[in-house]
Amino acid sequence: MARVMLSQKHRITECGSGEEYMISMYENIVFDKSSQQHFKTLFDILCKDLDGAILYHCTGGKDRTGITTLYLYTLLGVSEEDIIEEFSTSDIFNKKYNKSRETLIKIFMPTSKRTKALLIALLHAKREYLEAVINKIKDRHGSVLNFLYDEIGITKEMQEKLQLIF
């Protein structure tokens, strides 16, 4: 993780702050055509008649997983405020993990204090990250649900199937 974060420090610095970088990263996850195709594949799998459970996660459990959960909960009819609140709980559950990563950054990363502060900001699941990308989606599509229909390729039938399954 430290190598990836260090390799991205120029992009982080260009954005001005860790928070701005995170918002731009979330926008990339949402609006990148390749990412959209991966999300479509995920929802195709979720709509299949499968035995057992499906688990999804990522390294930190907040970025790609957070966007996936935004999409799934939207399709299930969960309120936007509840989705954002749920996303924000990631910081509670990752508190120990984040603390250890902060310590590693402070001690072992050969970079300035400012860059370290920016990198530390990346560890957190701030509601502002998700709110910003939701607002950008709404600006372009009117709602997250419209975005899922227009860009991800979700159909009303898929949404109804997911509501039956979950």
Predicted segments — roles?
Residues 1-55, 68-166:
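Cys-dependent protein tyrosine phosphatase-like superfamily
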Residues 59-60, 64-65:
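Ser/Thr-glycine-rich phosphate-binding loops at phosphate-binding pockets of nucleotides
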